[in-house]
C-alpha cells in the first residue's frame, strides 16, 4: 500500500459511533481496521516508516487501544514495549500524572523502572484529540529522564487542537479529520 494512500485506507476502515462514551462525543472505532490483516499491517508499516531499527529504545502504548498498535510497532523497531495505564492498573511502583480529556479528567501511570535515563521513546496511540493524554505521556517520559523522539497516531481530530499542545515536529498522524 503506497504511503500516500494510508490516510484514505485508515478513513475507509474506521467507523464513527455517536454519543460514545458520553453525549456529544463521536468515538472513532478502529476495530474494523484491526480486523483486516492487510490494513492493520499497512498501518503498522506506516507508523514505523519514519524510524530506523535501533533508533528507538522503547515504544509507549497508551491504554487501551494504543497497546494494540504500539506493540507491533515496538516489535518492528526492535524496541521494548511500555504500557501507560490508567491509575491503579499497574502492579509495581509508578510515576503518575493527571490531565484533562475531551470528556473529563484522568490519571495515567507508568512503572518507575519502565525507562532507563536517556532511553529514546516513541509514543503511539490511536487518536490525538485534545492532546492531554499525549502531553501527559511526555511528562511521564521526562520524569523518568528518558527522551521522547516522536508521537504517532492513527487518527488526529484536528478541530480539537491537540497538536498545538505538543511539540509539532514530533507529531505524526496517519489521518487528520
UniProtKB/Swiss-Prot annotation:
Q: Please name the CDD domains in this protein's record.
A: PRTases_typeI
Q: Where can this protein be found?
A: Cytoplasm
Broad class of enzyme this protein falls into: transferase
Q: State the EC number(s).
A: 2.4.2.7
**GO MF annotations, alphabetized:** adenine binding; adenine phosphoribosyltransferase activity; AMP binding
Reaction(s) catalysed (UniProt annotation): AMP + diphosphate = 5-phospho-alpha-D-ribose 1-diphosphate + adenine
* Keywords noted in UniProt: Cytoplasm, Glycosyltransferase, Purine salvage, Transferase
Q: Which Pfam families match?
A: Pribosyltran
Q: Which GO terms describe its cellular component?
A: cytoplasm
Q: Tell me a GO biological process for this protein.
A: purine ribonucleoside salvage
Family matches, as SUPFAM superfamilies: PRTase-like
- Which pathway? Purine metabolism; AMP biosynthesis via salvage pathway; AMP from adenine: step 1/1
Q: Its family?
A: Belongs to the purine/pyrimidine phosphoribosyltransferase family.
Under NCBIfam families, the record lists: apt, PRK02304.1-3, PRK02304.1-5
Q: Which proteins does it associate with, and in what oligomeric form?
A: Homodimer.
What job does this protein perform? Catalyzes a salvage reaction resulting in the formation of AMP, that is energically less costly than de novo synthesis.
What's the protein called, per UniProt? Adenine phosphoribosyltransferase
| Organism, scientific name | Acidothermus cellulolyticus (strain ATCC 43068 / DSM 8971 / 11B)
Give the classification, highest ranks: Bacteria, Bacillati, Actinomycetota, Actinomycetes, Acidothermales
Amino acid at each position: 500500500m503506497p504511503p500516500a494512500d494510508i490516510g484514505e485506507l485508515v478513513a475507509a476502515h474506521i467507523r464513527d459511533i455517536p454519543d460514545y462514551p458520553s453525549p456529544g462525543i463521536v468515538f472513532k472505532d478502529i476495530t474494523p481496521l484491526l480486523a483486516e490483516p492487510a490494513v492493520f499491517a499497512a498501518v503498522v508499516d506506516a507508523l514505523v516508516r519514519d524510524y530506523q531499527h535501533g533508533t528507538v529504545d522503547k515504544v509507549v502504548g497508551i491504554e487501551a487501544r494504543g497497546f494494540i498498535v504500539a506493540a507491533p510497532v515496538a516489535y518492528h523497531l526492535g524496541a521494548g514495549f511500555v504500557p501507560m495505564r490508567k491509575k491503579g492498573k499497574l502492579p509495581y511502583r509508578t510515576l503518575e500524572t493527571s490531565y484533562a480529556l475531551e470528556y473529563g479528567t484522568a490519571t495515567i501511570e507508568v512503572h518507575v523502572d519502565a525507562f532507563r535515563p536517556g532511553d529514546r521513546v516513541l509514543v503511539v496511540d490511536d487518536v490525538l484529540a485534545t492532546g492531554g493524554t499525549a502531553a501527559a505521556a511526555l511528562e511521564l517520559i521526562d520524569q523518568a529522564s528518558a527522551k521522547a523522539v516522536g508521537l504517532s497516531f492513527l487518527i488526529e481530530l484536528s478541530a480539537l487542537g491537540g497538536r498545538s499542545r505538543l511539540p509539532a515536529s514530533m507529531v505524526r498522524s496517519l489521518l487528520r479529520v
